[in-house]
Every structure is written in structure tokens, then in C-alpha cells.
Amino acid sequence: KIITKIFKTGGEIAYKNLKRSKKKYRTTVISIIVSVVIFIAISSFIQYGFKMSSAYYTEKNYNYVVYARTAEILTDISNLPDIGEYSINKSNIFEMNMDDKHKSELTEYGKNIKNRYYAEDKNGNLIDNINIISLNKSSYENYVKNIGGNYETYKDGAILVDNNINVDDNGKRIQGSMYTWKKGDTVTGKIDDKEYSIKIVSKTEERPNGVENLYNTEAYFIVSEEFINKTGFKSAALYAQSNDTDKLDEEVEQYKTENSFTNSDLNAFNMEESIRAENAVVLVISIFLYGFIGVITLIGITNIFNTITTNMNLRKKEFA
């Protein structure tokens, strides 16, 4: 009676058919549910795939990276016609002894990270490392301006970037600051076995180009080119925002050939090309998965129509 009131005559007939052939109707319902669930699951997976394939690149302010044996090579590359806006980053390691004083300067988050990922010097003593990265003058001036600073005030000190993201032992994402240091503090450590005292002129979460990789166990000191030229550096890289990365590829290859450089001397990474390659792979997977969804959906729809048609033919009198 309730079904008749709500769904009228059609509902009553459907209910009778359900009672007569429960297995067939369960199969029909299951087919519908499975088709919908698979469609939603695979669609979400494909969207996630596209998102993840480009997330690493699209969040950056550069689309071309060059690694070279010397900073002079990078300076030459910076003069190529299609280089666009660029930043030349030089880097080194600032090493500190993990003594009681330094441990007291770590936050609880920092202690957790350092206990899990510790480093040792050549004598087996526990140490803590901070990446020192310099920017060429124009890039450093723009960076300092963006964080509300002044070049002349900041050029002899270090800007602390200390917003770390990592994963715990359970694979859960964790985030925090590793040090209790603040603006005006002085930190003592070694660069290439020579002792230096570095004054922290600012603390920020804003990262310059080339310092976007958050999954690490170390913080960063961002310094001027003048500063790192005094202390020395181990490696250098150029980060560019080019309007035509394919043309820039050709120009870099030509420069490489003219100077008889090998990949160990000069290596370029076209991020636009990588995005295209990854998206092509995801597209092929998408076509396959959507084809699979189509087959499953077609089977489900066929089952539904077959069941409905069969039952209608068997119960023509009731419909009449």
C-alpha cells in the first residue's frame, strides 16, 4: 500500500517483479552501483594524475634550468637571446656541531627531524647542515624587496628560510619550523672547514627560484652573491623563465657544441618538455581507463535493458 501511494501503479508492478525475481534485480542494481563507483573512482584517479604530473612544475616561477661546471658558463648562458628572466644560484653547506647549545636552538619539530635524519662529519661527530644559496645581484635585490628588506642592510647577512615539510614514520605529512632563531641572532659554523659567524637579517617563508623543494631535512640561508663569493661555493645553477624553451634548447646546444662542452660541463633541463611528456603518458593511460569505464558501463546498461525487456515481455498482461 505504501509503495502504491508513493510510486503509483508503476511502482506496484516493479515491486511485484522484484519479489518474483530478486536475483535478477539484485544483479541489475549491483551493475548500476559498480558502474557508477568505477566511473567515479577512475575519473578521480585520472584527474589526480594530471594534477600531480604538473604540480611539481606549475608552482615554480621558472621553466628552464641549467647546471654548469663554472659560474662563468652560466653567465654566458644568461646572455642567450631567449633566456628571459633568470636567476643564477650558487650554493654551499653551512656545517654546525650538534652540541647541547645547538640542540637547544631546535624546535620540537626540528628535534624530531634531526633525530630521524642525522648527519656526521668525517670524524663521526654529529653535525647539522644548512644550505647556503646565493642569488645574482638583480634577483637578490628583487627577493629582498619582496620580503620588505633593503639590499645594503641584508647583503652581509643571511635570510633564514625555515618552513619545512616532511613525512613522519607513518607516511603522514608534517610541517613546521626547525629552529628557534629569530632576526638579529648570530649563528656560528663552518663552510669548507673554515669558521664563520652569520647574522640572520630576516626570517621568512618566501622562497626564491630554485628553493621550492619542500621535502627536505634542512633549512636555507639565502645570501647575496657578494657574501658567497667571499666564502666560496660548491655548485651553481641558472633558473630561467623563457618565452620559448624549445628555441632556448637549440641555443644552449649550439653554445655547448661551439665550446666542445660535455654533459658534465653543462646540462640543461627543459621543464616545458617534461610537462608535455608526462601529460602524454597520462593521456594514454586516461584513454585506456576511460575505455575500460565505457565497456563496464555498456555491460551494465545492456544488463539493465535485457532485464527490463525480458520482464516486460513476460508480464504483458499486467501492463495491459
Feature-to-residue mapping (PLM):
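Feature of multi-pass inner-membrane transport and sensor proteins
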Residues: K1-I30
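Alpha-helical transmembrane segments of integral membrane proteins
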Residues: T28-I38, S286-N306
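Hydrophobic alpha-helical scaffolding
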Residues: T4, F39, I174-S177, Q241, ...
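Intracellular alpha-helical coupling/juxtamembrane segments of multi-pass membrane proteins
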Residues: N17-L18, E278, I285, R315
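Histidine kinase transmitter module recognition
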Residues: N17-S21, Y56, I304, N311
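Basic-flanked hydrophobic alpha-helices used for secretion and membrane insertion
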Residues: K51-F292
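Interfacial "coupling" helices/loops that link adjacent transmembrane helices in transporter permeases
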Residues: G300-A320
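Alpha-helical transmembrane segments
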Residues: K24-R26, V34-Y62
